[in-house]
């Protein structure tokens, strides 16, 4: 340890500067940056960070161990992502997603659609505690409905993500909703109640914006006729209401606190079983085998791991009826691993901590302290590329500062959620941004400007802090009582 030196600010920033330059070049030169360009950029930036680490006296073994550790921490997300790919495949061939689109077109008014998409996504996400499951299931169906009535897919994706991350932030079943108060040192329900002060006005503004967009949207240019969509779906699938048993079972097991991996596996297999029962024509279209048992096995496997594209008389509808299974998620898995390598190297040499030191010194007033926390969460979401790191590290960094200023821990936990949780999906190379972009098939840069809830949240929490609205402080003589969290 004695031979190791602390990095200068320039040394700590150098890998990030290299990363920003490479990512900018990729956007200019490559159409599909997720196809490999951004992954290589992250690895090259990690190589630069490794050179800095060696210059500071760190050995390769310590850097390697940190890389392995950070990749290991991302494995649950990677496994969930792969299962979501399989679930999307079996839910397509079973007719679950087409049925959602079919019946949704009858129930949802075009002008109220975006408003409804936010509300529905929020309700499902609060009930399940998972933005990922919400977006991969009801979100995919809502995107199909939105495209069918002629709304730009980026706007629809923004509405879905806004609602889903409301639930991710507010649901007592959500992992981030439990993680933030644990890092800050408060209890879960105090944390949730305190979040309502900033979350409710943020959600209200989000709904108003989407309501205005919906009523100002020009539907005369819609490229898909709703009746044509319904007719094409009806001609390809058996759209029985019984198909809704699949999502009902999935959401039920999630609400019962069955872990995400077995929950998604149950949903995937159930989708395959319903495909065999309800969609024999689809099964035979995919496999071409004479024996139905063989055809069923082939179709289920193909939907779970590979490309499936079903054709209808309407070419526009065909865009809604395709999936890539697990294989479609591999570029995103590659991106997540690359991001974890970069984050691991940066953390191993203390480069991330060095960059945030000036931010901590800047935090004098309550407003500046909250703004510094927000900025740090954004920084870690961008550089470490992981939502959990963006909550855990700032939570540990700033916890003592909040105590010293007499601020109750729920202010810190709320700030971690208002910035760390919701902004992760706005970063293309963050695990959340990369995943939701791949699941919805919409580029992160395209939907980010319309994810109003995620954009407004950090500004709302800073506004409350600077205006001293609902800022909880310890009374004179009151001692902090916080939950100790092991490192």
What are these regions (language model features)?
Residues 107-197, 201, 374-418, 483-485:
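Hydrophobic transmembrane alpha-helices that form the pore/transport pathway of multi-pass ion
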Residues 57-147, 306-399:
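Membrane-embedded alpha-helical segments and adjacent helix-loop junctions characteristic
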Residues 3-10, 102-109, 127-131, 230-239, ...:
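Short, amphipathic, aromatic/basic-enriched membrane-interface segments that mark the entry/exit
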Residues 52, 76-163, 177, 197-200, ...:
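Early transmembrane hairpin of solute transport permeases
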Residues 19, 41, 45, 49, ...:
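Alpha-helical transmembrane segments in multi-pass membrane proteins
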Residues 169-172, 177-231, 242, 404, ...:
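Juxtamembrane and boundary regions of transmembrane helices in multi-pass small-molecule transporters
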Residues 1-80, 197-207, 211-335, 480-487:
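Hydrophobic transmembrane alpha-helices of multi-pass small-molecule transporters
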Residues 52-59, 146-153, 170-174, 274-285, ...:
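Juxtamembrane membrane-interface segments at transmembrane alpha-helix termini
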